[in-house]
Amino acid sequence: MAKEIIFADDARNRLYSGVKKLNDAVKVTMGPRGRNVLIQKSFGAPSITKDGVSVAKEIELKDTIENMGAGLVREVASKTNDEAGDGTTTATVLAHAIFKEGLRNITAGANPIEVKRGMDKFVEAVTSELKSAAKKVDGKKEIAQVATISANSDSSIGDLIAEAMEKVGKDGVITVEEAKSINDELNVVEGMQFDRGYLSPYFITNAEKMQVELSSPFILLFDKKITNLKDLLPVLEQIQKTGKPLLIVAEDIEGEALATLVVNKLRGVLNISAVKAPGFGDRRKAMLEDIAILTGGEVISEELGRTLESASLQDLGQADRVVIDKDNTTIVNGAGDKDSIEARINQIKAQIAETTSDYDKEKLQERLAKLSGGVAVIKVGAATETEMKEKKDRVDDALNATKAAVEEGIVVGGGAALIKAGNRVNLSLKGDELIGAEIVKRALFAPLRQIAENAGFDAGVVANSVSCADCPNYGFNAASGEYVDMFEAGIIDPVKVERIALQNAVSVASLLLTTEATVSEIKEDKPAMPPMPDMGGMGGMGGMM
């Protein structure tokens, strides 16, 4: 297929046109008074959102060069979302502002490579200024403030996330699901829960709740299938003498072994229950080891030269309580050694830091939560499915922003932190490097200007007022139209979100500015389908008989 090659200013201007179109659609969502964007779906009802990355992902432009420009900035939004979980609109607005300012200077004759070098040096300095201005997040109130800002000033979402984080801790897992009613709910699972239910309903002890409830049980962990009762008999005899309940966690229990356990349970000989081990393959072995450490037991594994027949009471784990329903097993207050649990937690944290797979990271995070505190489930309710999806997007954003705030701290929000950090930077640069630094410095005003504009205020006046050098916490509250102490007003942003948004925006804008040629396919207009031939006279075919 033939290719179209465009050079220099023509190429950059076409790329800028695409970036501008994407930015114009995304920027309207910014700030507490940002507007909604309605997105047509290929099937089903249209979706409505105030989430920048959701808007960016839907944009495909007809012109191939424009689409390449938009695609690069779309990548900025997605990458910022992946790394920080929020700040996608900020990243898009910054990338557009830097590209726009840079394009003007490069068209006037500045050297793109020198300009890029100056931009990189300035961003590095701004990033360190942001980190030095960061304030550690302490307590439920600040967590609620961060979550509220990220959820487009919805305080009910902020309070819900703060409560969830207070209950499960910063290492706990918080998941977001759709509720079956119009109300938001928070469910917290104490202890370790895994998604395996009882192997037989005959194990149920609480018929009203359809649950197995075991008080102070022994826990037997085995990493293979149990099919033969003979292997289990020695440990069952020891359990019977203690009079305590027993939970068996194994790859599977079937045939004669399961039938005999059920009969013994029904006759009252043993208070016993059995579940399958969670996970698959190597992950199953790791999770069994987690349960063993949490409960102070050992995994009976043939790989370690142990057989089920050799198991004794010393190999069994213990817990205050175990609750099993048809889908889940929950172990509460395992009797494991605190130092061993802490060592296991640190080991999993190290694995999280090393892994490059998002899936592995998510699974390791779940294991960490189960060992260190628990899991909270936020159920988002709304009157319609469209509203629920929009609200769920905001809850996800708020949750990610909160985690980022706990990780690296917070700075003043509303776009003020970037301006103040830029004003504090003092680099001795010359020539085109200085131009590069000035481009980024001017672009740092773009998020604040957009927030003010969306709220119906004069962007220039607001930017000049907030820019003062000797008022580090001073900023503009777009929701009320007042100038306030941002920390006192609870208008705060996570440093991680601001930092990653800026770094990604400069990265892609500098690539666009140093682009000297574009190569793209020439779209050929396919001829329209010819009209169907006139079928008149077909009705008279009956006369052929």
UniProtKB/Swiss-Prot annotation:
UniProt-annotated location(s): Cytoplasm
InterPro entries: Chaperonin_Cpn60_CS, Cpn60/GroEL, Cpn60/GroEL/TCP-1, GroEL-like_apical_dom_sf, GROEL-like_equatorial_sf, TCP-1-like_intermed_sf
HAMAP family: CH60
Gene Ontology biological process terms from the UniProt entry: protein refolding
Record GO terms (molecular function): ATP binding; ATP-dependent protein folding chaperone; isomerase activity; unfolded protein binding
One Pfam family matching this protein: Cpn60_TCP1
Catalysed transformations (reactions): ATP + H2O + a folded polypeptide = ADP + phosphate + an unfolded polypeptide
PANTHER family, A to Z: 60 KDA HEAT SHOCK PROTEIN, MITOCHONDRIAL (PTHR45633)
Main location: cytoplasm
Protein name: Chaperonin GroEL
